[in-house]
Every structure is written in structure tokens, then in C-alpha cells.
Amino acid sequence: MTKAEFKKLVENGPVILDGATGTNLQKAGMPVGVCPEQWILENPDIMIKLQEDYVAAGTNILYAPTFTANHIKLEEYGLADKLEEMNRELIALSQKAAQGKALVAADMTMTGQQLYPIGELMFEDLVDVYKEQANVVADAGADLFVVETMMSLQECRAAVIAIREVCDLPIMVSLTYNPDGRTLYGTDPATATVVLQSLGADAIGINCSTGPEDMIEPVEKMAEYATIPILAKPNAGLPELENGVTVYKTGSEEFASCGKKLVEAGASIIGGCCGTTPEHIRALKEAVKDMPVHKPLTQKRRILTSERKLVEITLDGNFMVIGERINPTGKKKLQAELREGSLNMVRQMALDQEENGAAILDVNMGMNGIDEKEMMINTIYEVTSTVDCPLCIDSSHVDIIEAALRIYPGRALINSISMEKEKMDKLLPIAEKYGAMFILLPLSDAGLPNDSEEKHAIIRTVMEQAIKIGMSKEDIIVDGLVATIGANPRAAIECYETFSYCKNELELPTACGLSNISFGLPERSYVNTAFLTMAIAHGLTMAIANPSQELLMNAAFASDLLLAREESDIRYIERMNMLAEKYAGQERVLVPVKKAAADVQTKPESQEGRSAIFEAVLKGNKGGILEEVKKALADGEKPDEIINYHLIPAINEVGVLFDKQKYFLPQLISSANTMKMAIEYVEPMLERNDAEQKSTIVVATVEGDIHDIGKNLVVLMLKNYGYNVIDLGKDVPASLIVETALKEQAKVIGLSALMTTTMMRMKDVVELAKEKGCDSKIVIGGAAINESFADEIGADGYSKDAADCVKLVDRLLEE
């Protein structure tokens, strides 16, 4: 199936997907803990009958049961060597069931391992895992791909890149979101939509997370940004436990009624996930068959993103600053740190610039004495783990830009692409492949343009070439190419002409670097500020500048105010209030006469009495935590004081931010690992007697369940709080859990389960513990677990996440 054919199919929709596979196979006898793909191949008639029933119910696209048939998952069952054979046979089963009446989508999902820097799996290794599976299923005759039930945007990116590098089949991608509207990693539906459609996905959506009613709002949000069709595949409500059996209570008619609302909200591809049956799909098909199809946006919005934040660029919106500080040019201290492999200054520069109002951060690692590509990649990992601002990738080397774009977990900006043949011919296809925006630098092989007319001709040429290869005007920001007025008295005027031309004639946003305009002049800040305010009035959209220069930033806020831009009055007042609070009782110097800015490293200042150790944990500064701990020890603080007065309060604050959805899984893990480093350093210095040792806790993922991301985080957090944690791993029998708890005299047993099919193994542990006289408190958690389930099976408590688990354990042991 071609992408054009897929697009036409949806235009004639709504397109009906199938319903649940797993929950229906369990009803048919699939045991807990087996490899689903292997069981299906051993019981093919059950799978074929289920999918035949879906086709009879009106399904247009069947999901082949290749869901977890990737190398990493199959290896857990000792079946990795059978990957090709199994995937081919599974595709063939669905083709047999479809009988040409429905398309067959090769189904792919997450591997269960976390990507670096949160986990140990490297991005390129994950791409290879997906490529291996994609190659087989494409060759086996799959009509299209679906990448579903994803929690990590970066894993989605890896899958889409892998599939696009293997074949040209259409790709649908759907993520699963928490009740707060974000993934476990903090990505919202709008950000996921922008990133994945820019990367080349053919449909974007949501599956599994909730029942159909709760999917309406995320679908509406996606529809505001989507230039591709939207997919919705809800559960038949949320899972409930009745007499030890997981049930979904949304009936087929109610499901179909809600399905109509999803189509009205913008979904043009719709089906069912957990708990749905052919009856649900039949009712859904009947309910939506005559409904008009939502038409995606025909014009893209100019948007950059990180993994957790979206920044929209509009021609008449508020002025933006691209932070320029992460660049070693002229910064001797930064150069020295980079040569040593340290990114402490880079991390602090990122934090400072975000705090000072930068909307985007430029990242440049161009210097001698380092591996620039390796340093650029490491910097992207560090900065994206530290701040939420989207990044601007700045390098003179094509291969470095491509390497950075490949691993960047969002939609980045390239700085820059000119009309120089080497740059334009190589970088435009790279920008298109990775869905990036780019700054158009109006230079050619002949050098600088002689006048505005030549400059404008270069802009048009590059723009037309970008459109020719599949990009759009909305992917472009034009650099005004600022020259110094010392060499060209008309330099500023020519820039103003370019800004006006781009905005009014081409409808393109503009950017520039400010400092060139005043090169060689005294008191340059006045010239730069005057140039900026006039440039904004002529249509300048953003500038690459230092956001800590208050005179410049204040002028930008004031310019927006005078141009009556949206909420500019509120933004200006908030800015002035922030500065008044910052400088309360101090003398303000907006324009220092002398400034060695190139070598200044801002040190994290204490906030509300917070120590540098506290701040290092709060910000996840793994590179700086030990230095601060050593300083504290040298100043006379005792190891237990460092833990009790700095580390514990800091991780408590991280937990508060996590509860408020201001921090997400990446920040939580980064802070926890930072604290772990500090504790491991000071622990040998502690003088503890046995009475001071905290209790022992046995933690395990229950039998039949091979998911351990959440469990691993719980282990990390409990250890950081001083507990002696025995981690038994995943797929652990009840007998081993209870036996270990008795042997180690554990005060608490912690149980994890991701799947509804393995929830009841928790009850097995509770009952066996009672039978064996084990008086350990039992706490449980997992995606499908709730308080009522904990009460029903007789557990002592339920925790919704790792931070909550620490509080629960503390409370239970105080009783």
C-alpha cells in the first residue's frame, strides 16, 4: 500500500480498525506468562477466528499479532533466533483471516527497556531492533505499519526512523497517556503530533489509555495541530476486578455512541483496544459509517519542540530569544571543561538561559581538541535532560547536524542552511528526513550578497528548493545576515528591508545574530538594543542573543507591548515584577561598562536557604554533585548531616514536583541517580549501629510479568531513602518472594505488575504470605492497579508511583 493510497482510504472513511487481541485470547485460554506470539502460532485457529470475526464486523485494518515480536522481547523468552520465522507466520495468519477484505498492519511496540540517558539502551541500537522486525514484516507482505501503546516519544521516533529506512509503507503511531494528559515521560498529545508528523508518520493517535469518553479531549488537542489523520483506539472502559477476573464494563452500544464523539472530535481512524470484541467493532462501524471525515490541517504550524514542550513561532507573535551561550567560541573556561569531557558549565548555561527567558537554546560545540560530534551528542543528552526548551543545532559540519537531529527527542531547528551547493544539497534532505525546521542563511557560493535584491533572490531560491523536496514555507526561518555598520553604514537598513520583505512578501519569520551590528564600537549594548527594537518593528521574529542581558530583554518585552501583541501587557508587567523581586534591596546595573561575559560561569545560587547539594539533586546534576558533597565535608559537615539536611529534603522536593506534574519520569530518575551517587560516596563514612539501619524490603515484579521499569525506579528511590532493598527482578514466583521475605526478615514486600493479566499473581503472594506466617507488610503498584484492588486482595497499601511508594512505606512502618 502506498502512502497516497492510505491517504485516499482515510479520506473516504472513517476507517475502522479491529478491537482487542490480548483480552480475547485470554478468554480463549491463553495462559498468563507465556510468549503471546508463540502461543498464537501454537493455536492459530483461535487467532484466525477472532480476526475473521473482526473483518465480518466491518474492520478495514487488522493488526497482525506481531506486537512484541521484536528481538529484545523475544530474547526474554529465548526465542530471538526465531524472530524472522515467527513474524512471517504471524503476518500470514492475519492475511489468511483478512482474505483480501481488510488490510494487514504489522504491529510494533515498545521493548520494555529504557533509552539512554534514563536507561542503558542506546538510540541506534533501538533503531536496529525495530529495523530487524520491520524488514521481515515488510517482506512478508504487510500493507502498512502501526506503532502502538507507546509511552516514550523517543521510542516512537526510533520506530518511525527504522521503518522509513526500510520501506515506504504507511506508518500509524499511537501513544498511551496518563489521566493528566501526558505520557509517563511528560509528552503531551500536541507535542507528539508535531514531532511524529514532521518525522514522516502518516497517522497519529492514542490507544489503550482510557475508555472512549476520556479520549475526546486528547483527540481534540491533536486535531489543532495534525496535518495527518488522527487515530483513536480506546479500551472498553477501565479494567475492574470481579471475583478475581479482570472485566471491562463498557458495552458495545455505549462504546459506539462514544465512538461517534471521537469522530466528531477529529478521529478519522477508529477501533478498540483492551476489552473490546467484534460486537464492539460492529456497533462502532454502524454508528460512524455515514459521518463526515475530519480533514487535517492543510497548512503546517511553525512549531519547535523538546520532548515535553512545544514552542510556536508566528509572524505577529511575541518576540523570542534563541539563547546563544552554549558555544565554546571565546570561552576559555568552557573550552577547558569540554576538553576534560565535563558538561557542568553547559548544564548551568542551559538552566540560566531558560530561567532568563530564552525560548530556544542554540547548541554549538565547534572547537579544536575534542571530538565535536561526540560532544554534540553528549550535550544534547545533557541539555534535554536538564531543560524543556527546544534546541537549535548549530554546526558547520553536515554529519554533526545529522547525528544530532537523529537522537534529538523532539523537533529541532538547524542553524543554518545557505545556498552554498555543498550545504543546500546535503542539508535540505536531512532536514526533511528528520522533520526539522531550519534557519535560511542568505549566502551563496559567491559569498555575501551585494545588496538586498541579491539577498532576497537567494532566499527565494533556497525556499523553492526546500518546497521541491517536500518541505514547506512553514519549515523556514530567514536569517537577516547582519553586517557591521562600521564597514557598511547601511547594514542595519538592509536588514530592516529583509525583515519586512520576508514578513510581508514571503510570509516567513526571521532571525538574526545581534552582536555583529555594533562590532568595533564603544558601548555596544546601546547600539544592539536600538537595532533590536527597530528590527522588531520591521518584522524581526527572533534573535540569537544572551538572555541574561537585561537591557536587551527588557527592550524586547517593551517592543511587544508597544506593538500591542497578544498578552504583551501581562508579560511586560510580569517581567518587571520578576526583576523587582530579583533585585530587592540591591543596586541594579543594566549596562556594565566592562564585562568578561565569555568566561563567566553562573553558579547555582541558594534559593530559600537551599544548598548547592540540594540544587544539584533537584536539577539532576550528576556531574557536579560529588564536588559539592566534597566541599561540604571539607567545611566540616558530617556525612549523616549531608544525607538528612540536604539529600533527603531535595529528593522530597523532587517528589512534590513529580506529584504536581512539573517533573516527569526523566527528571525523577535523573534526580534519583544524582542522589544515589552522593549517598554511595558518603555511605562508607557513616557510623551506624544496627539499630540505626533502616528496614529490609523485598521488591519483585510478579510471576508472568516481564515489565520492570516502574519497579526499578521504586528500588532506586527506596535505596536513596536508606532502606535495605532486595530486588528479585521480574517474573518472580510467589514462593520465592515469600521465602526471601521470611529469610531476610523483611518488613515490607513490594509487588509490581503492568498487565491486567498478571494482577492476580499479587493475590497469590498475599495468600501465601498469610499461609506461611509471613507478617511483612505488602504494598502493590502498577499501571492497572488501584486502591480498591489492593483492598480486595488484602494488601496493606497501594502506591501510584515511586515517590508515593516511599511515603507509603514510611507510613506503614511508623504504625
Give the residues covered by each predicted segment.
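Domain-level signal for soluble alpha/beta catalytic cores
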Residues: M1-D479, A483-E815
